[in-house]
Amino acid sequence: MKRSEKAAIIEQLKAKADAAPIAVVTDFKGMPVEELTRLRVKLRESGGDYTVVKNTLARIALTGGTHDVLKDNFSENCGVAFGSEDPVAVAKALVEFRKGSKLFAIRFGSLEGQFLDDKQLDALAKLPGKQELLAKALGTMNAVPTNFVCLFANLLRNFLYALKAIQEQKEAA
């Protein structure tokens, strides 16, 4: 590989790493191309990206950036998953993919510059995703006005029942 090609790969990796709050280093040794393609598709669906890269190029690209804590841990065959939208969704996609593949392993990762081992990444994958949290927050915010409207409607209904009872009482007398 020419020096200019290496520089281009390093710049591309650096751009991905700087834009991504999460980076996860995986082992893909012995995986067929079809399985890697399925992994890439699954990650794209969850807002991520998967790159197979030489260890030295990854070390250079990650040095001095958000995921600097990863640079000293690269060994053997590595692939790096970057997630730019929802870190939890990327972690979930990787953990789910690992369940279906005997050759795929999650080694370690970085979330906003904090080193995460595979057990911490498993715990991250169990958290609710961004969309789920937004839905819960909106549901909670929507509950207050809904409850107010129901309370007000009940007050009006009870007031009307009281007026109707008074009217019936006067008509009977």
From Swiss-Prot:
Q: What is this protein called?
A: Large ribosomal subunit protein uL10
Oligomeric state and interaction partners are given as:
Part of the ribosomal stalk of the 50S ribosomal subunit. The N-terminus interacts with L11 and the large rRNA to form the base of the stalk. The C-terminus forms an elongated spine to which L12 dimers bind in a sequential fashion forming a multimeric L10(L12)X complex.
Q: Does the keyword Calcium apply?
A: no
What family is this? Answer: Belongs to the universal ribosomal protein uL10 family.
Q: Which GO terms describe its biological process?
A: translation
Which keywords fit this entry according to its UniProt record? Answer: Ribonucleoprotein, Ribosomal protein, RNA-binding, rRNA-binding
NCBIfam families in the record, alphabetically?
PRK00099.1-1
InterPro entries found in the cross-reference section: Ribosomal_uL10, Ribosomal_uL10-like_sf, Ribosomal_uL10_bac, Ribosomal_uL10_bac_type
The record, for Pfam families, names: Ribosomal_L10
Q: Which HAMAP family match?
A: Ribosomal_uL10 (MF_00362)
Keyword Ribosomal protein listed: yes
One molecular function GO term is: large ribosomal subunit rRNA binding
Organism field: Oleidesulfovibrio alaskensis (strain ATCC BAA-1058 / DSM 17464 / G20) (Desulfovibrio alaskensis)
Tell me the function of this protein: Forms part of the ribosomal stalk, playing a central role in the interaction of the ribosome with GTP-bound translation factors.
Task: Identify the GO cellular component terms for this protein.
Answer: ribonucleoprotein complex; ribosome
